[in-house]
Amino acid sequence: MEVVVKDWGVSLGYSRGALVIKKRGGVDRIPLFQVDRIWILTGGVSISSRLVRALSHHFIDVVFFDAKGNPVARLFPPEANGTVTHRRAQYEAYLTGRGFELAKLVTYGKLINQARALRRLGQWKREHYGALAEAASKIADLAGRIPSCADVQCVLGHEGAAASLYWDAVSKTTGLPGRNPEAADPLNLALNYGYGVLKYAVWRQAVIHGLDPYAGYIHADKSGRPSLVLDLMEEFRPHVDLLVIRLRPSADWADGGVLKREIRAMLVEEWTGERLEPVIARQVGLAVAHLHGQRAYTPHQL
Protein backbone atom coordinates (compact mmCIF):
# COMPACT_ATOMS: atom_id res chain seq x y z
CA MET A 1 0.00 0.00 0.00
CA GLU A 2 1.20 3.48 -0.89
CA VAL A 3 0.41 5.90 1.97
CA VAL A 4 0.07 9.47 0.68
CA VAL A 5 0.04 12.30 3.24
CA LYS A 6 -1.15 15.59 1.71
CA ASP A 7 -2.66 17.53 4.63
CA TRP A 8 -1.16 19.73 7.33
CA GLY A 9 -1.36 18.67 10.96
CA VAL A 10 -0.99 14.93 10.38
CA SER A 11 0.99 12.93 12.93
CA LEU A 12 2.58 9.59 12.03
CA GLY A 13 3.46 7.11 14.76
CA TYR A 14 3.93 3.43 15.46
CA SER A 15 2.11 1.12 17.84
CA ARG A 16 1.75 -2.65 18.05
CA GLY A 17 3.00 -3.38 14.56
CA ALA A 18 0.92 -0.69 12.88
CA LEU A 19 1.41 2.71 11.29
CA VAL A 20 -0.77 5.13 13.26
CA ILE A 21 -2.03 8.18 11.35
CA LYS A 22 -3.57 10.89 13.51
CA LYS A 23 -5.44 13.62 11.66
CA ARG A 24 -8.47 15.82 11.94
CA GLY A 25 -11.47 13.63 12.25
CA GLY A 26 -9.87 10.53 13.63
CA VAL A 27 -7.10 7.98 13.72
CA ASP A 28 -6.19 5.39 11.09
CA ARG A 29 -4.15 2.26 11.79
CA ILE A 30 -2.47 0.32 8.99
CA PRO A 31 -0.51 -2.88 9.70
CA LEU A 32 3.08 -2.14 8.77
CA PHE A 33 3.37 -5.26 6.63
CA GLN A 34 0.77 -3.70 4.31
CA VAL A 35 2.76 -0.46 3.82
CA ASP A 36 5.03 -0.25 0.79
CA ARG A 37 6.02 3.41 1.15
CA ILE A 38 5.01 6.71 2.74
CA TRP A 39 4.79 9.86 0.60
CA ILE A 40 4.78 13.19 2.47
CA LEU A 41 3.69 15.95 0.10
CA THR A 42 3.32 18.91 2.46
CA GLY A 43 4.75 20.58 5.55
CA GLY A 44 3.25 20.43 9.01
CA VAL A 45 3.59 16.64 9.28
CA SER A 46 5.27 15.00 12.27
CA ILE A 47 6.80 11.52 12.35
CA SER A 48 7.96 9.69 15.48
CA SER A 49 11.45 8.26 15.89
CA ARG A 50 9.88 4.96 16.87
CA LEU A 51 8.12 4.80 13.51
CA VAL A 52 11.35 5.70 11.69
CA ARG A 53 13.12 2.76 13.37
CA ALA A 54 10.28 0.39 12.50
CA LEU A 55 10.18 1.55 8.88
CA SER A 56 13.94 1.13 8.58
CA HIS A 57 13.71 -2.39 9.99
CA HIS A 58 11.09 -3.27 7.37
CA PHE A 59 12.94 -1.50 4.51
CA ILE A 60 10.04 0.92 3.95
CA ASP A 61 10.85 4.26 2.32
CA VAL A 62 9.62 7.64 3.50
CA VAL A 63 10.00 10.34 0.85
CA PHE A 64 9.36 14.07 1.27
CA PHE A 65 8.42 16.39 -1.63
CA ASP A 66 8.14 20.14 -1.82
CA ALA A 67 5.20 21.85 -3.52
CA LYS A 68 6.97 21.83 -6.90
CA GLY A 69 7.62 18.09 -6.90
CA ASN A 70 11.26 18.18 -5.87
CA PRO A 71 12.20 15.20 -3.68
CA VAL A 72 13.81 17.00 -0.73
CA ALA A 73 14.52 14.06 1.58
CA ARG A 74 14.30 10.31 1.78
CA LEU A 75 14.54 8.01 4.80
CA PHE A 76 15.91 4.57 4.06
CA PRO A 77 18.01 1.97 5.94
CA PRO A 78 21.81 2.12 5.60
CA GLU A 79 21.85 -1.50 4.43
CA ALA A 80 19.97 -0.55 1.25
CA ASN A 81 23.15 0.13 -0.73
CA GLY A 82 24.63 -2.19 -3.34
CA THR A 83 28.21 -3.34 -3.67
CA VAL A 84 30.98 -0.75 -4.03
CA THR A 85 32.26 -2.51 -7.16
CA HIS A 86 29.40 -0.92 -9.08
CA ARG A 87 30.62 2.58 -8.20
CA ARG A 88 34.12 1.69 -9.26
CA ALA A 89 32.80 0.46 -12.61
CA GLN A 90 30.75 3.65 -12.91
CA TYR A 91 33.80 5.88 -12.45
CA GLU A 92 35.97 3.79 -14.76
CA ALA A 93 33.28 3.96 -17.44
CA TYR A 94 33.68 7.72 -17.54
CA LEU A 95 37.30 7.28 -18.61
CA THR A 96 36.81 4.34 -20.99
CA GLY A 97 33.86 5.83 -22.89
CA ARG A 98 31.51 3.08 -21.76
CA GLY A 99 29.53 5.66 -19.78
CA PHE A 100 29.08 7.85 -22.84
CA GLU A 101 27.81 4.83 -24.77
CA LEU A 102 25.28 4.23 -21.99
CA ALA A 103 24.15 7.85 -22.18
CA LYS A 104 23.70 7.60 -25.95
CA LEU A 105 21.57 4.46 -25.59
CA VAL A 106 19.41 6.06 -22.89
CA THR A 107 18.91 9.19 -25.02
CA TYR A 108 18.11 7.04 -28.04
CA GLY A 109 15.49 5.30 -25.90
CA LYS A 110 14.03 8.63 -24.84
CA LEU A 111 13.55 9.79 -28.43
CA ILE A 112 12.04 6.48 -29.51
CA ASN A 113 9.64 6.72 -26.57
CA GLN A 114 8.75 10.29 -27.53
CA ALA A 115 7.87 9.02 -31.00
CA ARG A 116 5.81 6.20 -29.49
CA ALA A 117 4.08 8.66 -27.16
CA LEU A 118 3.00 10.82 -30.10
CA ARG A 119 1.63 7.80 -31.93
CA ARG A 120 -0.28 6.79 -28.82
CA LEU A 121 -1.59 10.33 -28.49
CA GLY A 122 -2.71 10.01 -32.10
CA GLN A 123 -4.86 7.06 -31.07
CA TRP A 124 -6.58 9.31 -28.55
CA LYS A 125 -6.80 12.21 -31.01
CA ARG A 126 -7.72 10.44 -34.24
CA GLU A 127 -8.34 13.72 -36.06
CA HIS A 128 -4.67 14.63 -35.51
CA TYR A 129 -3.16 11.20 -36.12
CA GLY A 130 -1.47 12.22 -39.39
CA ALA A 131 0.31 15.25 -37.91
CA LEU A 132 1.36 13.32 -34.83
CA ALA A 133 2.63 10.38 -36.88
CA GLU A 134 4.65 12.74 -39.08
CA ALA A 135 6.31 14.33 -36.03
CA ALA A 136 6.92 10.86 -34.59
CA SER A 137 8.71 9.78 -37.77
CA LYS A 138 10.96 12.85 -37.68
CA ILE A 139 11.85 12.17 -34.04
CA ALA A 140 12.58 8.51 -34.80
CA ASP A 141 14.92 9.68 -37.57
CA LEU A 142 16.76 11.90 -35.09
CA ALA A 143 17.01 8.97 -32.69
CA GLY A 144 18.67 6.93 -35.41
CA ARG A 145 21.47 9.48 -35.64
CA ILE A 146 22.43 9.32 -31.97
CA PRO A 147 24.46 6.05 -32.04
CA SER A 148 26.95 7.65 -34.45
CA CYS A 149 27.52 10.72 -32.23
CA ALA A 150 31.13 11.17 -31.16
CA ASP A 151 30.55 13.74 -28.41
CA VAL A 152 27.99 15.01 -25.93
CA GLN A 153 27.12 18.12 -27.96
CA CYS A 154 26.03 15.96 -30.88
CA VAL A 155 23.69 13.97 -28.61
CA LEU A 156 22.28 17.12 -27.02
CA GLY A 157 21.72 18.67 -30.44
CA HIS A 158 19.55 15.77 -31.63
CA GLU A 159 17.77 15.62 -28.27
CA GLY A 160 16.96 19.34 -28.44
CA ALA A 161 15.66 19.10 -32.01
CA ALA A 162 13.46 16.17 -31.01
CA ALA A 163 12.11 18.06 -27.98
CA SER A 164 11.10 20.98 -30.20
CA LEU A 165 9.23 18.67 -32.60
CA TYR A 166 7.65 16.73 -29.75
CA TRP A 167 6.24 19.59 -27.71
CA ASP A 168 5.18 21.53 -30.80
CA ALA A 169 3.13 18.50 -31.89
CA VAL A 170 1.63 18.09 -28.41
CA SER A 171 0.69 21.76 -28.20
CA LYS A 172 -0.89 21.93 -31.66
CA THR A 173 -2.98 18.79 -31.24
CA THR A 174 -4.14 19.09 -27.62
CA GLY A 175 -4.51 22.84 -27.13
CA LEU A 176 -2.17 22.61 -24.15
CA PRO A 177 0.76 25.03 -23.87
CA GLY A 178 4.23 23.93 -24.85
CA ARG A 179 6.92 22.82 -22.44
CA ASN A 180 8.46 25.51 -20.25
CA PRO A 181 9.80 24.35 -16.87
CA GLU A 182 9.60 27.89 -15.49
CA ALA A 183 5.96 28.45 -16.50
CA ALA A 184 3.17 28.47 -13.92
CA ASP A 185 0.39 26.97 -16.06
CA PRO A 186 -1.17 23.70 -14.82
CA LEU A 187 0.42 21.55 -17.55
CA ASN A 188 3.97 22.62 -16.79
CA LEU A 189 3.43 22.54 -13.04
CA ALA A 190 2.08 19.00 -13.33
CA LEU A 191 4.95 17.91 -15.58
CA ASN A 192 7.47 19.35 -13.13
CA TYR A 193 5.79 17.47 -10.30
CA GLY A 194 5.60 14.23 -12.27
CA TYR A 195 9.26 14.48 -13.25
CA GLY A 196 10.08 15.03 -9.57
CA VAL A 197 8.35 11.78 -8.64
CA LEU A 198 10.20 10.03 -11.48
CA LYS A 199 13.48 11.53 -10.27
CA TYR A 200 12.91 10.06 -6.82
CA ALA A 201 12.12 6.62 -8.25
CA VAL A 202 15.31 6.54 -10.35
CA TRP A 203 17.40 7.97 -7.51
CA ARG A 204 16.12 5.25 -5.18
CA GLN A 205 17.14 2.51 -7.58
CA ALA A 206 20.55 4.10 -8.21
CA VAL A 207 21.26 3.97 -4.47
CA ILE A 208 19.91 0.43 -4.09
CA HIS A 209 22.18 -0.72 -6.92
CA GLY A 210 25.20 0.95 -5.34
CA LEU A 211 25.68 3.68 -7.93
CA ASP A 212 26.77 7.27 -7.32
CA PRO A 213 23.72 9.43 -8.16
CA TYR A 214 25.94 12.45 -8.83
CA ALA A 215 28.36 10.97 -11.39
CA GLY A 216 26.64 11.05 -14.78
CA TYR A 217 27.72 11.11 -18.39
CA ILE A 218 25.48 13.57 -20.27
CA HIS A 219 24.26 16.04 -17.66
CA ALA A 220 27.11 18.30 -16.62
CA ASP A 221 28.70 17.95 -13.20
CA LYS A 222 27.44 20.54 -10.74
CA SER A 223 27.41 20.64 -6.97
CA GLY A 224 24.18 19.05 -5.74
CA ARG A 225 23.06 17.89 -9.19
CA PRO A 226 22.30 14.14 -9.39
CA SER A 227 23.66 13.86 -12.93
CA LEU A 228 23.41 10.06 -13.21
CA VAL A 229 19.80 10.15 -12.03
CA LEU A 230 18.99 12.82 -14.61
CA ASP A 231 20.70 10.70 -17.29
CA LEU A 232 18.83 7.51 -16.45
CA MET A 233 15.39 9.07 -16.04
CA GLU A 234 15.32 10.51 -19.58
CA GLU A 235 13.76 7.49 -21.30
CA PHE A 236 10.90 7.48 -18.77
CA ARG A 237 9.86 11.12 -19.21
CA PRO A 238 7.37 10.28 -22.01
CA HIS A 239 5.50 8.07 -19.50
CA VAL A 240 4.99 11.13 -17.30
CA ASP A 241 4.02 13.23 -20.32
CA LEU A 242 1.26 10.83 -21.35
CA LEU A 243 0.02 10.47 -17.78
CA VAL A 244 -0.33 14.24 -17.37
CA ILE A 245 -1.82 14.82 -20.84
CA ARG A 246 -4.37 12.07 -20.25
CA LEU A 247 -5.51 13.80 -17.05
CA ARG A 248 -6.16 17.06 -18.97
CA PRO A 249 -4.72 19.74 -16.64
CA SER A 250 -7.12 22.62 -16.04
CA ALA A 251 -6.99 26.05 -14.41
CA ASP A 252 -8.45 24.76 -11.13
CA TRP A 253 -5.42 22.50 -10.61
CA ALA A 254 -3.25 25.34 -9.31
CA ASP A 255 -3.44 28.19 -6.84
CA GLY A 256 -0.84 30.95 -6.71
CA GLY A 257 1.48 29.21 -9.15
CA VAL A 258 1.54 25.97 -7.13
CA LEU A 259 -0.42 22.75 -7.64
CA LYS A 260 -3.13 22.19 -5.06
CA ARG A 261 -2.39 19.47 -2.51
CA GLU A 262 -5.14 17.18 -3.78
CA ILE A 263 -3.72 17.41 -7.32
CA ARG A 264 -0.24 16.52 -6.06
CA ALA A 265 -1.70 13.51 -4.28
CA MET A 266 -3.59 12.50 -7.42
CA LEU A 267 -0.41 12.64 -9.51
CA VAL A 268 1.43 10.43 -7.02
CA GLU A 269 -1.44 7.95 -6.98
CA GLU A 270 -1.59 7.92 -10.79
CA TRP A 271 2.18 7.37 -10.93
CA THR A 272 2.08 4.42 -8.53
CA GLY A 273 -0.81 3.01 -10.55
CA GLU A 274 1.46 2.89 -13.62
CA ARG A 275 3.62 0.29 -11.81
CA LEU A 276 6.79 1.55 -13.46
CA GLU A 277 9.12 1.12 -10.51
CA PRO A 278 9.90 -2.56 -11.23
CA VAL A 279 10.73 -1.49 -14.80
CA ILE A 280 13.01 1.27 -13.49
CA ALA A 281 14.73 -1.25 -11.21
CA ARG A 282 15.33 -3.53 -14.19
CA GLN A 283 16.72 -0.71 -16.31
CA VAL A 284 19.12 0.44 -13.60
CA GLY A 285 20.26 -3.16 -13.28
CA LEU A 286 20.90 -3.23 -17.04
CA ALA A 287 22.86 0.01 -16.70
CA VAL A 288 25.05 -1.61 -14.04
CA ALA A 289 25.72 -4.57 -16.33
CA HIS A 290 26.64 -2.17 -19.14
CA LEU A 291 29.06 -0.23 -16.93
CA HIS A 292 30.78 -3.49 -15.99
CA GLY A 293 31.10 -4.36 -19.68
CA GLN A 294 28.94 -7.46 -19.29
CA ARG A 295 26.35 -6.53 -21.93
CA ALA A 296 25.22 -3.48 -23.89
CA TYR A 297 22.34 -1.53 -22.37
CA THR A 298 18.91 -2.18 -23.86
CA PRO A 299 16.67 0.93 -23.71
CA HIS A 300 13.19 0.68 -22.25
CA GLN A 301 10.35 0.95 -24.75
CA LEU A 302 7.10 2.71 -23.98
Curated annotation (Swiss-Prot):
One record GO biological process: defense response to virus
EC code: 3.1.-.-
Cystine connections: none
Cofactor(s) needed for function: Mg(2+); Mn(2+)
UniProt: Mn(2+) binding residues: 159, 219, 234
InterPro entries, sorted: Cas1 (IPR050646), CRISPR-assoc_Cas1 (IPR002729), CRISPR-assoc_Cas1_C (IPR042206), CRISPR-assoc_Cas1_N (IPR042211)
Alphabetically ordered keywords of this record: Antiviral defense, DNA-binding, Endonuclease, Hydrolase, Magnesium, Manganese, Metal-binding, Nuclease
MF terms in GO: DNA binding; endonuclease activity; metal ion binding
Gene3D superfamilies in alphabetical order: CRISPR-associated endonuclease Cas1, C-terminal domain (1.20.120.920), CRISPR-associated endonuclease Cas1, N-terminal domain (3.100.10.20)
Leading EC class: hydrolase
Quaternary data: Homodimer, forms a heterotetramer with a Cas2 homodimer.
Family as reported in the entry's similarity comment: Belongs to the CRISPR-associated endonuclease Cas1 family.
Function: CRISPR (clustered regularly interspaced short palindromic repeat), is an adaptive immune system that provides protection against mobile genetic elements (viruses, transposable elements and conjugative plasmids). CRISPR clusters contain spacers, sequences complementary to antecedent mobile elements, and target invading nucleic acids. CRISPR clusters are transcribed and processed into CRISPR RNA (crRNA). Acts as a dsDNA endonuclease. Involved in the integration of spacer DNA into the CRISPR cassette.
Protein name (Swiss-Prot/TrEMBL): CRISPR-associated endonuclease Cas1 1
Organism of provenance: Pyrobaculum aerophilum (strain ATCC 51768 / DSM 7523 / JCM 9630 / CIP 104966 / NBRC 100827 / IM2)
